[in-house]
Regions:
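A residue-level signal for conserved active-site and pocket-lining positions in enzyme catalytic cores
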Residues: 20, 74, 78, 100, ...
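Short glycine/serine/threonine-rich phosphate/pyrophosphate-binding segments
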Residues: 26, 80-85, 194-199
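Catalytic core of DAGKc-family lipid kinases
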Residues: 104-183
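ATP/nucleoside-binding phosphotransfer catalytic cores, i.e., glycine-rich phosphate-binding loops
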Residues: 157, 173-176, 225-311
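Gly/Ser/Thr-rich active-site loops/lids in small-molecule metabolic enzymes
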Residues: 179-182, 186-223
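Redox-cofactor binding/interface segments in oxidoreductases and associated redox assembly factors
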Residues: 17, 75, 187
Length: 311
């Protein structure tokens, strides 16, 4: 079972709204959402720039004040938007509900066509909160941590723009796992098992399983296979690519360059992402609908990255 709890009926005083401004319908949906919530006696707030663009600058709050005031956050965008908000709010432990304005919408629970129904379900307590495991990644150079970040989906270590292989040597809790020569490796959460890892041959892992996945990317050997590892383990990836570009990406959105001899350390993050889910919609139903039943333009999926890796 996924770690969940029923929130039950609770009078929500303030709901935050996060908006991806690049989505054509985002501001219109945000305006409608604001009206419906205020009609029901719920206050709303936004990020300062979004509030200003909507014409309500008084509703814009900086992050710390935003996080201290809201009890729940609605996210208007796609999966990429939700990933960014999950990373931003994880340390505040605020539940988030995604409204899909993107292409795939695998992580988003609600559709904007059912906006009023979704708001009613939230205000009546008709939902559960799922605790999704997150990752913390550190780049270690000459014994010192030089970069770090957290991920909900995955941490990718990959070659740069030229078609030359890199070598990744993996250790779990100091024990040698294997050496992977190819395009790189992915360390993912169960939530991320349906993302980049899946396209590289990794398994779909039920979100409630406490595990980490290690998936090779185009490994140049017949014996390299994805591995499912304990969630409490510490994974060290030693990278080697003399005179070649390589880098690390976090949820496909944040990137750092790597150098020969760097170590990427990945472990479970101390906080979980709190995702709002409907009780009558199962993970397997979403898998069937999103990954089997829909025609997806793969050239556009994942196009919501907020940043590009610098390699």
């Amino acid at each position: 079972m996924i770690a969940t709890w029923l929130l039950g009926w609770k009078w929500l005083k303030t709901i935050g709204i996060k908006v991806n401004r690049s989505k054509p319908k985002a501001f219109a949906v945000a305006e409608k959402m604001k009206r419906e919530l205020e009609t029901r006696g719920v206050a709303v707030c936004f990020e300062p720039d979004i509030a200003a663009d909507l014409g309500y600058p008084e509703l814009g709050l900086p992050l710390e004040e935003f996080a201290s005031r809201v009890e729940l956050v609605f996210v208007l965008g796609g999966d990429g938007t939700l990933l960014g908000v999950a990373r931003q709010l994880a340390r505040y432990q605020i539940p988030i509900l995604g409204f899909n304005l993107g292409n795939l919408g695998f992580l988003s629970e609600a559709e904007t066509g059912g906006l009023s129904e979704a708001i009613e379900r939230v205000l009546s307590g008709d939902y559960v909160i799922e605790c999704r495991l997150m990752l913390k990644a550190e780049v270690i150079r000459n014994g010192r941590v030089i970069e770090s970040g957290v991920a909900l989906n995955d941490v990718g270590i990959a070659k740069g723009s030229f078609g030359r292989m890199i070598t990744c040597t993996a250790y779990m809790d100091g024990n040698f796992l294997g050496t992977y020569t190819g395009d790189g490796v992915i360390i993912s959460t169960p939530t991320g098992s349906t993302a980049y890892s899946l396209s590289c041959g990794g398994p779909i892992v039920y979100p409630g399983i406490r595990a980490l996945l290690l998936t090779p990317i185009c490994s140049h050997t017949l014996t390299s296979r994805p591995m499912v590892l304990p969630s409490e383990s510490v994974i060290d990836i030693h990278v080697s690519a003399v005179h070649r570009e390589m880098g690390i990406t976090i949820d496909g959105q944040i990137g750092y360059c790597l150098k020969e001899g760097d170590i990427v350390r990945v472990k479970r993050y101390k906080h979980s992402a709190l995702l709002i889910k409907w009780q009558d919609r199962s993970f397997f139903e979403v898998v069937r609908q999103k990954l089997q039943g829909e025609s997806v333009d793969v050239s556009r999926v994942g196009g919501e990255h907020e940043g590009t890796a610098p390699y």
